Amino acid sequence: MENPVPIKKAVFPVAGMGTRFLPATKASPKEMLPIVDKPLIQYAVEEAVAAGCTELVFVTGRNKRSIEDHFDKAYELETELEQRHKTALLSHVRDILPSDVTCLYIRQAEALGLGHAVLCARAAVGNEPFAVILADDLIDAPQGAIAQMAEVYRQTGNSVLGVETVAPSQTGSYGIVEVSPWQQYQRIQSIVEKPKPEEAPSNLAVVGRYILTPRIFSLLQTVGRGAGGEIQLTDGIAKLLEHEPVLAHAFAGKRYDCGSKLGYLEATLAYGLKHPETAEAFRTLLQKYSQVEV
């Protein structure tokens, strides 16, 4: 096969209301919730950039201006830090995005689901393959999940979904795929959105990472409203299966479901224990609390 076009564009659907974290998300998006000293969306962006993406498309909603501000220049803050000789902090602020990376913000006028959010990015993505990253799913890995999946795409030219095995009782929270061996990969045979455990084709779940060919856009235009009355990306992918191979990639790394309170707290613990400024003292603090009856 000819060498496929490299993945240069990443789409971040960030228009959700974050109701699980109210009232914290009443005026601030859930993607700006911090894990130690960086917001979730920054971890997602860093993963995309590390995979070679240089064009970042944020599909936003109301109350999402802080995401745009976070990735914009902050002249007053930089001047203040420079005057106070806080060079380390100044470097952190200036280096949030490499100079060759550009950001585009598109408003999703109605909350019509993940498939609709991806469709909103069509004009920005054009006729190129692209990544979709859900910031709720924080993945800690030596090589980012999108970089791993981009390598599979480079070898095959096919769409790739990031997957992991979940407990059968959890299938109702995910898109679930059925796979079969294909060359040295796993080809998806079917995909269904949030099935009951007894109706799930497997317990292999799609978890917030996608590399998609541009054909997905025309297919998303044809799907009606699915689960929850929304335009589901899962339904578009189900149609994509009829036209081309779609692969499942069980990425190496630990995923934290930061869309749930418990997953968010677990991520905070894990990242706090390895952060150079907090690791030692935080470990001591946890040992202290572990001795207290709960």
Where are the regions a protein language model picked out?
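Residues at the starts of beta-strands that form the adenosine-phosphate
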Residues: 9, 54-56, 102, 129, ...
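Catalytic-core segments of class I nucleotidyltransferases/pyrophosphorylases
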Residues: 131, 150, 154, 181-284
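N-terminal glycine-rich phosphate-binding loop and ensuing alpha1 helix
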Residues: 2-86, 144-148
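Structural beta-sheet core signal
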Residues: 12, 58, 132, 161-162, ...
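Well-ordered alpha-helical segments embedded in enzymatic catalytic cores
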Residues: 40-43, 116-120, 236
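Conserved beta-loop-beta/alpha segment of the NTase-like Rossmann-fold superfamily
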Residues: 69, 77-80, 94-176, 212-214, ...
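Conserved beta-strand scaffold positions in the cores of enzyme catalytic domains, especially
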Residues: 32, 103-105, 159, 246-248, ...
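Short, conserved catalytic or adaptor-binding loops enriched in Gly and charged residues
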Residues: 91-102, 180-182, 239-241
